[in-house]
Amino acid sequence: EQETENVGEDFILQEIIHNQFANKEYEATEQALRDFLSINHSKDAIDRGTFYLGETLLYQGKYQQALSCFLQVQDRFPDLTTRWIQVALDGYQLPTSSY
């Protein structure tokens, strides 16, 4: 039963990535991934969904939210997240105050 559940999770994630993310429909991808992550899934599926959400947020310029996603899965995907964390940090700038 666990294996069947994992196959279903994999299928849903791949559908989101191939049908929306690949077509640069980032707002739709973000919503689909947030919906996916709101349901109880395996740790592996949650980690992958969180990573994909980070990428989606990054492409929308939501650097702080993207950074948060990448930091959540940094231990799981160290090689992949290192680059994306740096990109998010480069894009994210603290607001400057003028005195």
Regions found by a protein language model. Give the residues of each.
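Alpha-helical linker/edge segments of TPR/alpha-solenoid repeat scaffolds
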Residues: E55-S68, A88-Y99
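Long, contiguous interaction/recruitment modules in multidomain scaffold/adaptor proteins
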Residues: E1-E5
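Short solvent-exposed coil/turn linkers within tandem alpha-helical repeat scaffolds
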Residues: N6, I39-A45, L71-W84
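TPR/TPR-like alpha-solenoid helical repeat scaffolds
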Residues: D47-F51, D79-S98
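Alpha-helical segment of the N-proximal tetratricopeptide repeat
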Residues: G8-D35, I39
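Surface-exposed, polar/charged faces of alpha-helical domains
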Residues: E27, Q31, D44, Y63-S68, ...
